[in-house]
A protein has these predicted regions:
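Charged, amphipathic alpha-helical linker segments immediately N-terminal to NTP-binding catalytic cores
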Residues: 1-26
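Small-molecule kinase domains that catalyze NTP-dependent phosphoryl transfer to phosphate-bearing small molecules
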Residues: 137, 159-162, 190-236
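The Walker A (P-loop) glycine that initiates the GxxxxGKT/S ATP-binding motif of P-loop NTPases
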Residues: 50
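ATP-dependent NMP and nucleoside kinases share a basic, alpha-helical "lid"
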Residues: 132-188
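Conserved nucleotide-sensing/catalytic segment adjacent to the nucleotide-binding pocket
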Residues: 77-80, 86-132
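Hydrophobic positions on the alpha1 helix immediately C-terminal to the Walker A/P-loop
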Residues: 59
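Walker A (P-loop) phosphate-binding loop of P-loop NTPases
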Residues: 53
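Conserved lysine of the Walker
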Residues: 56
Length: 236
C-alpha cells in the first residue's frame, strides 16, 4: 500500500506491504481495541518508545488512518513527546542546547502532569515548533478515547522516567539495527541541507548517542516490534 500522510505538518508518502498490514499492524490495533474495551469509560494511554530514525511519527499516523477505516477500531490520536523539551532559555542556562533530544533536555514532571490530566478527561498537549525550535503550549486538543504517546525515552530505565509507567495501559518498543538507523538519520540531515561531513558530525554528537541509550537503557515493553533494514515492521 502506498499512502500519502501528513506527518508533523509535512506530506509523506509511506509504503506498507499488505502482509505486514494484515499480520502486524491490524492485529496490534485489534489488541489495543480490546484493552480499551475492558475499561471504555477512561482514556487508554499507549506508550510507543523507540530510538530516533524508526519512523514512529509516520507509523502512528498510519495507525490513525487504519483505525479511521475500520468501525471496529476506536479512534486514536498520536501525541508526540517532543513538546516536552525544556525551552531553549532553560537549555542555554544549563549548557544543554547542543544535546537537545537527550533525556536530560525533557521536562519529565510536566509530562507526568499532562498524562495525569488526559487520563482523567479532555485536556491539551504541547507541540514542538520546528520553526521556533521551542514548545508551543496547549497546541493539541486531546479528544480521542485512545492516545499513543510516542518518543525515545518513555521506557527509560531511570527513576524519574520509570514513574511514568503509572499512566501507561500498554507499551510498545521498536528495535532496529543501529547501522540502519545511522543511514536513515544521516540521510534525513542530508535531505535537510547539511553537508555529508556536518550530517555525520551531528549523528556522532547527538543522534548516535541517543540511539545507543534508547537501545541499551530501556525497560521491556508489552509488545516488541522490529524494524528491518528495509524499513518494514515485524513482531519480534
Amino acid at each position: 500500500v502506498k499512502i500519502k500522510l501528513t506527518v508533523n505538518g509535512l506530506q509523506v508518502e509511506a509504503h506498507y506491504h499488505d502482509d505486514e498490514i494484515e499480520n502486524v499492524h491490524k492485529p496490534l490495533l485489534q489488541q489495543l481495541a480490546k484493552i480499551h474495551a475492558a475499561n471504555p469509560q477512561r482514556r487508554t494511554i499507549v506508550f510507543l518508545c523507540a530510538p530516533p530514525g524508526t519512523g514512529k511519527s509516520t507509523l502512528t499516523t498510519f495507525w490513525e488512518y487504519l483505525c479511521a477505516q475500520d468501525p471496529c477500531l476506536p479512534e486514536i490520536q498520536t501525541l508526540p513527546m517532543d513538546g516536552f523539551h525544556h525551552y531553549n532559555s532553560w537549555l542555554d542556562a544549563h549548557n544543554l542546547r547542543a544535546y537537545k533530544g537527550a533525556p536530560e533536555t525533557f521536562d519529565v514532571d510536566k509530562l507526568a502532569q499532562n498524562l495525569r490530566q488526559i487520563r482523567e478527561g479532555e485536556g491539551f498537549w504541547p507541540q514542538y515548533d520546528r520553526q521556533k525550535h521551542d514548545p508551543v503550549e496547549e497546541a493539541i486538543r486531546v479528544t480521542a478515547p485512545m492516545v499513543i504517546v510516542e518518543g525515545n525515552w518513555l521506557l527509560r530505565d531511570d527513576e524519574r522516567w520509570r514513574a511514568l509507567a503509572e499512566f501507561c495501559d500498554y507499551s510498545l518498543f521498536i528495535r532496529a539495527p543501529a547501522n540502519a538507523l545511522r543511514m536513515r538519520l544521516v540521510g534525513r540531515k542530508l535531505a535537510g541541507g547539511l553537508s555529508q561531513a556536518d550530517a555525520e558530525a551531528f549523528y556522532e554528537r547527538t543522534d548516535g548517542p541517543n540511539v545507543r541509550r534508547v537501545l541499551e537503557d530501556s525497560l521491556s515493553a508489552d509488545l516488541m516490534l522490529e524494524m528491518t533494514l528495509e524499513g518494514a515492521y515485524r513482531t519480534a
